[in-house]
Amino acid sequence: MNQSQPLSEYPRPQFKRDSYICLNGYWEYAIRKEEKIPAKFDGQILVPFSPEVSKSEVNKVVLPDDYLFYRLNLDLPSDFIKDKVILHFGAVDQIAEVFINDQFVMKHVGGFLPFEMDIKPFLKDGKGTLVVRVVDTTNASYHSSGKQHLKPEGIWYKPQSGIYMPVWLESVTMDVSKN
């Protein structure tokens, strides 16, 4: 595994485009009790591994009343940028809010499905600070949690929070098909 950019292969081979940037790798992270985006982060996390697993290099449990923050500075080559710059998340457990340059972009609820958004309007000359704020209520709410449990035993296993599937960018023209 490429430690600086794990799982860097294109995640959807049947839809491969020529404009692809893998964002897996080291991001900054913070775990806080407040929802405000922190000025100071706790360290680095290896995306796309949840903070609870050793591959993330964090090994911390995110509790239901915690906010997990990710931050990554983007500096996209000018020849990469087309009509739209699509940011893809393979999956984030469980509620994710995405910000670019301190502007709210979108909220996604559901820890098992991919989601995407056009971030070009939020970038400044291809540059931007990407922040993802995550809440994972695990088994403390009505949201699907699978077999995750805060007190794992028997068939239950420890929670997995945050980004746990690949993250990538694609730049496309306006006539792109969603099929």
PLM regions with names:
Residues M1-Y20:
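N-terminal pre-domain segments of enzymes
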Residues N2-S4, L46-P51, A140-H143:
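Short amphipathic alpha-helical segments, especially helix-boundary/capping motifs
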Residues S8-Q14, E28-E34, K60-S177:
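Accessory beta-strand-rich segments of carbohydrate-active enzymes
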Residues D18-C22, Y67-L68:
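Short coil-to-beta-strand transition motifs
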Residues L23-V47:
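Predominantly extracellular/luminal regions of secreted and cell-surface proteins
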Residues D42-P51, Y157, I163:
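Glycan-recognition and processing domains
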Residues E57:
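N-terminal [4Fe-4S]-dependent radical SAM core
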